């Protein structure tokens, strides 16, 4: 599956499984067996003021056929901490 298609599947999967809006794609990597590992950031809690949303990063694992092979929450952080390497 081409990367652009895998990203679309990962975005839809993360949104469907969490019920939350997707904020963006943080990382992509082939998994070595023809599939993909894609990190999708979703907004778990929107900030009331400013840019301090609570973001969760989910690892979406897609098999070579594009089917869901795994789904894990990797971390949670405040948007202001994103660039700080949190």
What is each model feature region?
Residues 30-35, 63-67:
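A short, structured loop/turn motif at beta-sheet edges
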Residues 34-42:
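A short hydrophobic beta-strand element
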Residues 50-76:
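A short, surface-exposed beta-strand/turn
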Residues 1-28:
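Short, non-transmembrane alpha-helical segments in secretory-pathway proteins
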Residues 16-17, 43-54, 83:
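Short, cysteine-centered beta-strand-loop-beta hairpins and adjacent loop/turn segments enriched
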């Amino acid at each position: 599956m081409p990367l652009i298609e895998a990203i679309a599947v990962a975005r839809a999967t993360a949104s469907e499984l969490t019920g939350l809006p997707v904020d963006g794609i943080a990382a992509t990597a082939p998994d070595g067996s023809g599939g993909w590992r894609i990190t999708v950031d979703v907004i778990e809690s929107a900030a009331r003021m400013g840019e301090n949303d609570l973001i969760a990063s989910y690892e979406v694992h897609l098999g070579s056929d594009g089917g869901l092979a795994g789904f894990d929450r990797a971390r949670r952080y405040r948007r202001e901490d994103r660039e700080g390497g949190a």
